[in-house]
Amino acid sequence: TDVFVVSLSSAIDFDTAKGSFGTEIDFGAEGFAKAKLLLELADLDVAKVKQANQATDILEAMQVWEEMFEYLSLTALKIEYADDQLADKVLADVPDINQLKMMSEMQIDMFLGQYPEQAKQLKTAISGFLEDKNGFKVSATAKNPVGLNELESLYISGGLTDSISFEFEGN
């Protein structure tokens, strides 16, 4: 019989005094791939969390969560992917990796047109991943907590990188 091992671990750091929340989730399928997600948030209204958890009506709880998200801020987001053989299997039938790289580069240029440095770094990371198929990392670290409701306007205005530093790595 074939043995298939899946692992999942998570850690949560919830500081009610500071109103901060952090979580790290690790997921892996032995012999295929592993992924890690790290998320750090600030300006969490603990009273709203309690209010939402005590709500007896789902609509009331959703409204409280919506109010809470108006003030929630991002401090960090990191994603790491380590490949064993999953990418090899998924990409085995791709007729031309160079064409896939070109298509991804076009999408990146459209999405990150205002951010040429980050676009170049992301294209290099994706190219490195597609050529070596071993790992990929992305991180976004706020210089100071950035409101989740501010992200869209910062992105559109071209000011996102004034508030958040981005790093991309592929190998």
Spans of features found by a protein language model:
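Glycine-rich, small/hydroxylated-residue low-complexity segments
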Residues: T1-N171
